[in-house]
Amino acid sequence: MNGSYQAPAWMNPYVSGQAVGYSQAVMAYADYYGVDGSADMEPEIDERISMVPCPMVSYASRTGTRRNLEAMRAANWRLLVSAKGVLRTEGMRYALDNGAWTAFQQGEAFDQRAFGRAVDLLGENADWIVLPDIVAGGMASLEFSLRWLDRLKGIPTKLLLAVQNGMQPDDVRELLSPAIGIFVGGDTEWKLGTMNTWGLLARRRNCHLHVGRVNSARRITLCAAAGVNSIDGTSATRFAKTLPPLDAALRHAYGQQDLFNPSSMALQQVRFDCRG
């Protein structure tokens, strides 16, 4: 890796227990009600509250045009800020991408310094942060992500583990919780073919499920049916005129969620092997 990483100073109070952030609070709440993910592996634990599906949240890559930005703001979409991009939020809610995909497209190695700078500036108030991964790296990517998970131990922000071609639910199962979720990457065929599996696993572990590069109404519908919590895409970023139909598809998909959506199922209804 290029350069050494030092956690930002703002993390210190959370690590020492002097401050309580989202991750610490949600895990305390989840533990009390038995929905911290441990019931997945320990059947004797009862979940003492029911899971209720929430509207799927949409993020779009940062845009440089005011028209596109205002269209996103009006539709209550959020920004997905890349660590390799411009580190501005434009006053909108946002999540932080690790920049690995951008670096991959540019033929570059993962930029540790850029990621560290982004976490320092924006990490504390992000909805979530994608842990660094290796594009098309398979299990080597997971090992890389786990090193970063250890480095960011104590962070108050929700973290997402990137899963991709070749990974199985049991590879990440025991890592997941309301504070550590899933980012579904990989190529399009693999992503669409395994989305329901990750939705079932997310329900069993009660963790956040995000799917990347969702740029059509059909894929939005598929994501909603799989119990996905959030999506991102670039279509709305590039063209303000494409945002209304995508947003309409998002709202329609939420309104049409059926009983097979895993996020609304009781734990006993979801198979441990995550096959639907």
Predicted feature locations:
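Glycine-rich phosphate-binding active-site loops on the catalytic face of alpha/beta enzymes
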Residues: 186-188, 224-250
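Catalytic cores of alpha/beta
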Residues: 110, 171-174, 215-230
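Short beta-strand/loop segments at the ligand-binding rim of alpha/beta enzyme cores
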Residues: 51-54, 153-160, 201-212
